[in-house]
């Protein structure tokens, strides 16, 4: 078959259409329509099949992107899905939530002049279509080794570890405190980015592969780590980072101030019918003037959730300029379309409260961009005399996350760093092995809060380390 080498000129990049704005703003459903078969084939055909594919190297799991784009263009969906799963445990999830503009698509040779290949949406199409057509991972040639591994945490790192172990004949048993798998994929990422049926289907697939899940089971409460270490040949910790970071602001504990993650988790549990808990109470922003402090993707999740809860007005306040905002440009664009007001170069100084002690606004100061910090990002420097109050009824703090307390881990000789992260070097003889040789760890609890795909990559590498340790 002759190839049109100028296909990227003849056919421009096309993204999937979004649902109508009036529907998006009131529903917790994914806003992007899926590609049709014709759209997926045509967009996949734009790939140049570069000899040195930068997209593949920029991807943390090093997906065989040009290869499965070619298969998608040829309509060979089962083969594309099989190839996709060779490197990625959750390709249909990454196709939805990865910041492709900063990873594969941002590195596409066509990106600057012609528009990158729509890699993420084709990845989603390939795997959704394959599942719809009945494709499932084939483990018929896998021989059981008799080894068993306990995995604590059913988030992306834990699921990735379980996937690789299972494909190599090791029995994986996954423990998680939530009533569904996915961790923050399910309970932290709102349904307008990742519908929850995606993870329900994924649990069915994993169960069919032989992975066992023990949900609503919290280590330290329902099961003890000491018992797991006796019962299993190794233990993997993929517990994430759940402790919200605060800004040290005046009155930040006042009624009406909320941490981002409990707010998002409780909202999702409400939608899924799981109810609320004392540490994650459901909060409705209906009729309220909401201010979300922070500029990352979690902040975008909070402002867009508030819109769908029918907030009266929603502001995202960030201390740097838009260029230095860490959140996905795509998510910022979506939030703007949905009516969110962005205030850049404003530094929160404190929460204002009324006579009843409830939130009535946030005291801000304007900032200007200074010299770069240690990470290369320009510092936000307060402009003297620029203090002002922005009225509001609710404040959500989205300043990031750090490791939560793990008292159940303290007696098991696992070293932590100064920030409370587990020390588990990738470059050790057994990748991601901790100071307790029987315990491995990966994902956010090792590297700090990061992307879904980096957690998947580390979970898979940790599984390789475990296989090496078990000599299987």
Locate each region found by the language model.
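Cysteine-centered iron-sulfur cluster-binding motifs in ferredoxin-type domains/subunits
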Residues: 41-72, 81, 85-119, 153, ...
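A structured beta-alpha segment of the ubiquitous adenosine-cofactor-binding alpha/beta core
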Residues: 208-229, 276-282, 345-393
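Short Fe-S-cluster ligation motifs
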Residues: 5-21, 30, 44, 48, ...
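FAD-site-proximal beta/loop scaffold in flavoenzymes
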Residues: 253-287, 372-449
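Long hydrophobic segments that form regular secondary structure
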Residues: 283-320, 380, 388-394, 401-403, ...
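FAD-binding core/adjacent interface of flavoenzyme oxidoreductases
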Residues: 68, 92-94, 101-152, 213-288, ...
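A conserved FAD-binding loop/helix module that cradles the flavin
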Residues: 302, 445-471
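Beta1-alpha1 glycine-rich phosphate/pyrophosphate-binding loop at the start
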Residues: 6-33, 62-74, 83-85, 112, ...
């Amino acid at each position: 078959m002759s190839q049109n080498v100028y296909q990227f000129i003849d056919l421009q990049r096309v993204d999937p259409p979004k649902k109508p704005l009036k529907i998006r703003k009131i529903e917790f459903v994914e806003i992007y329509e899926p590609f049709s078969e014709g759209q997926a084939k045509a967009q996949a055909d734009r790939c140049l099949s570069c000899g040195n594919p930068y997209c593949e190297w920029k991807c943390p799991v090093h997906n065989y992107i040009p290869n499965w784009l070619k298969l998608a263009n040829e309509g060979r969906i089962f083969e594309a899905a099989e190839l996709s799963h060779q490197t990625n445990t959750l390709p249909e999830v990454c196709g939805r939530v990865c910041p492709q503009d900063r990873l594969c698509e941002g590195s596409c040779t066509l990106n600057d002049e012609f528009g990158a290949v729509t890699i993420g949406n084709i990845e989603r199409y390939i795997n959704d279509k394959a599942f719809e057509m009945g494709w499932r991972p084939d483990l018929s040639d896998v021989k059981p080794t008799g080894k068993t591994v306990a995995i604590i945490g059913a988030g992306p790192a834990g699921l990735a570890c379980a996937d690789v172990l299972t494909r190599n004949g090791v029995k994986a048993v996954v423990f998680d405190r939530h009533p569904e798998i996915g961790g923050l994929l399910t309970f932290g990422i709102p349904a307008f980015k990742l519908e929850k049926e995606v993870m329900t289907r994924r649990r069915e697939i994993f169960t069919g592969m032989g992975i066992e899940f023990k949900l609503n089971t919290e280590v330290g409460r329902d099961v003890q780590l000491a018992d797991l270490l006796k019962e299993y040949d190794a233990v993997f910790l993929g517990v994430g980072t759940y402790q919200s970071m605060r800004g040290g602001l005046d009155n930040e504990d006042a009624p009406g101030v909320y941490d981002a993650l409990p707010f998002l988790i409780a909202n999702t549990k409400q939608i899924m019918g799981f109810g609320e808990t004392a540490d994650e109470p459901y909060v409705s922003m209906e009729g309220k003037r909401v201010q979300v402090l922070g500029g990352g993707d979690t902040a975008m999740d909070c402002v867009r959730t508030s819109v769908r809860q029918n907030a009266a007005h929603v502001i995202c306040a960030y201390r740097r300029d838009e260029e230095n905002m860490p959140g996905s440009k795509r998510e910022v664009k979506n939030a703007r379309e949905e009516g969110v007001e962005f205030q850049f170069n404003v530094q929160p100084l404190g929460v204002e409260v009324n006579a009843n002690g409830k939130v009535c606004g946030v005291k801000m100061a304007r900032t200007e961009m200074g010299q770069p910090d240690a990470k290369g990002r320009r510092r936000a420097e307060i402009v003297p005399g620029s203090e002002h109050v922005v009225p509001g009824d609710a404040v959500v703090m989205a300043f990031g996350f750090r490791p939560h307390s793990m008292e159940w881990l303290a007696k098991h000789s696992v070293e932590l760093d100064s920030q409370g992260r587990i020390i588990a070097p990738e470059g050790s003889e057994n990748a991601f092995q901790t100071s307790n040789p029987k315990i491995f760890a990966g994902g956010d609890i090792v590297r700090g809060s990061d992307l879904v795909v980096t957690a998947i990559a580390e979970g898979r590498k940790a599984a390789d380390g475990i296989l090496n340790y078990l000599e299987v």
